[in-house]
């Protein structure tokens, strides 16, 4: 099996070309035929939908009750402002969520750089335009930043009791993935006399919160961790849970001699291998009457003695005989 695995080519060359600070071209070769699309598609899906990042998920704008409002002295309506807020590239260090403020008096352009941040938060695209103030209006807002993965629509964060949510807290559809665009192609590669090999080319662009090369490295790590479980399909052998023996009434473990039956009745029971009270109560009247030398008088005696102890014939016991009797 190991020999068959070793026969596969593994990539020997990887070339990373930086096109811009947020865009890179990665070439990986040689790959066995078909593996270009196999790896390319897997990495693409992880990079676009499974990468963790930060995004603005909620906004409170002074004087705005809902997203269909307009702000006097601001060129954009509220929906446009919310769309622009989704384009802010933000990084948080050591936090899962935080609240930032923005305050800008016009006239002028409101950019991501106007957001007031603390030492744990970075805005990677400070020139990103959020709104344009055309008058002397002052635009104030509170922005909630959260950490997440992939794409999260606003509806998925709303609580069941939406009516209790404060008016004016506007929810944003959040795209946490730091990858803005990814395309891959598979070209032909050659190694010595083999010409049927693949070359994988990845063209990746991020929002600036992560280096393109680091993004690919993280995606490959995620893929590796998910596939590692298949390397050994046996996994850890789970031992069968020990079945705890149900507690048995101690009186059932006592010998039939303790019932102080007549010698005739006691001997008849022992002849039928009935040694314990637990053995006896599981027999029916019909079964006992078939016992040699045990008549109705002896049967009545047995029933009366059992009744005095709260027992009767024909009872059913689970897990009988118990292990303690089997080992005797």
From Swiss-Prot:
Pfam families: RNA_pol_A_bac, RNA_pol_A_CTD, RNA_pol_L. One of its GO terms (biological process) is DNA-templated transcription. Keywords: DNA-directed RNA polymerase, Nucleotidyltransferase, Transcription, Transferase. CDD domains: RNAP_alpha_NTD. Residues 248-328 are annotated as: Alpha C-terminal domain (alpha-CTD). Homodimer. The RNAP catalytic core consists of 2 alpha, 1 beta, 1 beta' and 1 omega subunit. When a sigma factor is associated with the core the holoenzyme is formed, which can initiate transcription. This is DNA-directed RNA polymerase subunit alpha. It comes from Cellvibrio japonicus (strain Ueda107).
């Amino acid at each position: 099996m190991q020999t068959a695995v070793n026969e596969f080519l593994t990539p020997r060359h990887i070339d990373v070309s930086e096109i811009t600070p947020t865009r890179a071209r990665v070439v990986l070769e040689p790959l066995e035929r078909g593996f270009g699309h196999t790896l390319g598609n897997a990495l693409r899906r992880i990079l676009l939908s499974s990468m963790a990042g930060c995004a603005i998920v909620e906004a409170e704008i002074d004087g705005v009750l809902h997203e269909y409002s307009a702000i006097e002295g601001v060129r954009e309506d509220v929906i446009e402002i919310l769309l622009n807020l989704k384009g802010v590239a933000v990084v948080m260090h050591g936090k899962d969520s935080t609240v930032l403020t923005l305050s800008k008096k016009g006239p002028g352009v409101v950019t991501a750089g106007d957001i007031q941040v603390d030492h744990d938060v970075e805005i990677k695209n400070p020139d990103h335009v959020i709104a344009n103030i055309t008058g002397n209006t002052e635009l104030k807002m509170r922005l909630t930043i959260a950490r997440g993965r992939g794409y999260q629509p606003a509806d998925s964060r709303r609580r069941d009791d939406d009516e209790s949510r404060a008016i004016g807290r506007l929810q944003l559809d959040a795209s946490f993935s730091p990858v803005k665009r990814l395309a891959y192609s598979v070209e032909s590669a050659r190694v010595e006399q083999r010409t049927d090999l693949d070359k994988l080319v990845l063209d990746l662009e991020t929002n600036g919160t992560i280096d393109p090369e680091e993004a690919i490295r993280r995606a490959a790590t995620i893929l590796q961790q998910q596939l590692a479980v298949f390397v050994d399909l046996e996994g850890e052998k789970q031992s069968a849970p020990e079945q705890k023996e149900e507690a048995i009434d101690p009186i059932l473990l006592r010998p039939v001699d303790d019932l102080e039956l007549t010698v005739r009745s006691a001997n008849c029971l022992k002849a039928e291998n009935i040694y314990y009270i637990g053995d006896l109560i599981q027999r029916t009247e019909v079964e006992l009457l078939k016992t040699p030398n045990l008549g109705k008088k002896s049967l009545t005696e047995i029933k009366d003695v059992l009744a005095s102890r709260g027992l009767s014939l024909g009872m059913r016991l689970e897990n009988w005989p118990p292990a303690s009797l089997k080992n005797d």
